[in-house]
């Protein structure tokens, strides 16, 4: 009855087959848990809706049984006797107001307001942070794959060094630094609380992320090399500047397309992450300053580009953006 009042289980109602909801609710008491072996408890723990009148040692046993079934377990508690189960759980949650010092020390998280709804908000925040870390790592690695390919393959095509060390450092500062800041505060995915917990053994590049990172990096490198080669073999002196600038534009558009794994930027809205939008504009402005301010262009050893050349470099970024957006559509 208490579980129904708290909303843990539904109120009694008719169910298919003539059973009522009360008979479909499975509960275990501490006495029943005591009579079960660990293997028996493990076999039934997934089916139990309510655990009632359990002692601290029973809580520990329940946590261990759930973990043995491969679940990620969060345990709440406020007393000294809850400490073993709090410590054993993947996430121990202690009460900040009613909790004892021992329970707080044994926990990973403390609810300052003793409100269980705060746990849901904390889970969402944690998943969002993890998602954003994955997005940034994939974005950064893909961009670096592109730059490495440019540096490694260009000499085999009969060209001098395509990028100077200072230019590489500048690109990394703009992309990993400024764009990374914007990606770090991305909003949560729409389905973030409908997903199953991430497995502790799952890597950053799992679920196809590694494959996507590689092909995006190869695409960036191939586009920059193709553009630079066209300008080089047609005798254009600004071929290095075209590689340098196209890489900057491609990573700006790559960052915008990397905001969500499923949703299009047009659905999200550019200004739904104002920091990233601002950083993208800042990166473009800084890159243009390097091209057109004589002191900076001399320092970075680049040549000013014509309007046509600048649009050509920007079109490489638009191409990367279009391909990444189309991939999301086909995945759906």
Predicted regions and their residues:
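Mg2+-dependent phosphoryl-transfer enzymes with acidic/Ser/Thr/Gly-rich catalytic loops
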Residues: 30, 81-144, 185, 189-193
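Acidic (Asp/Glu-rich) catalytic motifs at the cytosolic membrane interface
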Residues: 76, 80, 84, 103, ...
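Hydrophobic packing and interface segments
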Residues: 20-26, 51, 72-73, 91, ...
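Secondary-structure transition/capping motifs at alpha-helix termini
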Residues: 6-13, 68-71, 94-97, 111-113, ...
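Hydrophobic residues within well-ordered alpha-helices
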Residues: 2-5, 85-86, 133, 294
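Short beta-alpha junctions and helix-cap segments that line functional grooves
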Residues: 2, 62-63, 89, 106-107, ...
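Cytosolic catalytic headpieces and adjacent flexible linkers of membrane translocases
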Residues: 1-65, 69, 76, 83, ...
